[in-house]
Design a protein with these regions (language model features):
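Mature extracytoplasmic or organellar-lumen-exposed domains after removal of signal/transit peptides
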Residues: 23-88
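Eukaryote-biased recognition of C-terminal alpha-helical segments
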Residues: 135-185
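Extended, amphipathic alpha-helical segments that serve as helical scaffolds
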Residues: 67-130, 135, 142
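Intrinsic-disorder-associated interaction segments
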Residues: 34, 76-79, 131, 138, ...
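N-terminal signal peptide
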Residues: 2, 11-29
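Eukaryotic basic, amphipathic alpha-helical target segments in cytosolic regions
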Residues: 19, 38, 42, 49, ...
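Eukaryotic intrinsically disordered, low-complexity regions
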Residues: 1-3, 179
Length: 185
């Protein structure tokens, strides 16, 4: 009898480890937080940005479509790890000097809070065993955004509007990435 209970516990333990991404936070909170972050970002819009500056930034710092393509083909844990890194990089970027940005500071703080909670929630889903080293290309991409757009344009309101648009694209892409896991479960 004791052996049978041990085998049942072992089986349940192994099965649970195999489906470690069955995470309550991801299943119940991710979509809400994702929607909140996108809504907050939309309230931060500044319509005074010149479209010629948009074209200039696109040539300087191209959106990393290839990285998202690779991530979409990765394991579930690697998808979440990639998403957590993107959210962490967004938080670092928005922590820079934003005194010239057109949005209210409270909105920006709320946005940072939601993005940080998203990253922490997803981090709890992948557990400590899956914290691989960061994707250097993702890190370098965000560093280029900081240098070429923010610093290059003097942290102006226009530079922050370009960053806001770029980050919205990232948030939509990571939402798609994580949503693919939600529909798969």
């Amino acid at each position: 009898m004791l052996n049978r209970m041990f085998l049942v516990c072992l089986f349940v333990g192994l099965f649970s480890a195999g489906s470690s991404l069955s995470c309550r936070w991801m299943d119940h909170k991710f979509r809400q937080y994702s929607k909140n972050s996108l809504d907050l970002l939309d309230t931060m819009v500044n319509n005074s940005t010149n479209t010629t500056e948009d074209a200039e930034v696109e040539h300087t710092v191209a959106f990393p479509n290839d990285l998202y393509s690779q991530a979409s083909k990765a394991s579930a844990e690697d998808k979440l790890g990639f998403t957590v890194q993107v959210l962490d990089e967004v938080a670092v970027l928005f922590d820079e000097d934003h005194s010239n940005a057109s949005w209210e500071e409270k909105t920006e703080k709320d946005f940072l809070g939601v993005v940080t909670q998203q990253a922490d929630g997803l981090r709890s889903c992948i557990g400590s065993h899956s914290h691989k080293k960061k994707n250097k290309k993702v890190h370098m991409y965000f560093k280029r955004l900081s240098r070429h757009v923010l610093e290059g344009m003097g942290h102006s309101a226009e530079s922050w509007e370009l960053i806001r648009k770029e980050i919205k694209s990232h948030l939509m892409r990571v939402d798609q990435l994580v949503s693919s896991l939600l529909t798969a479960n």
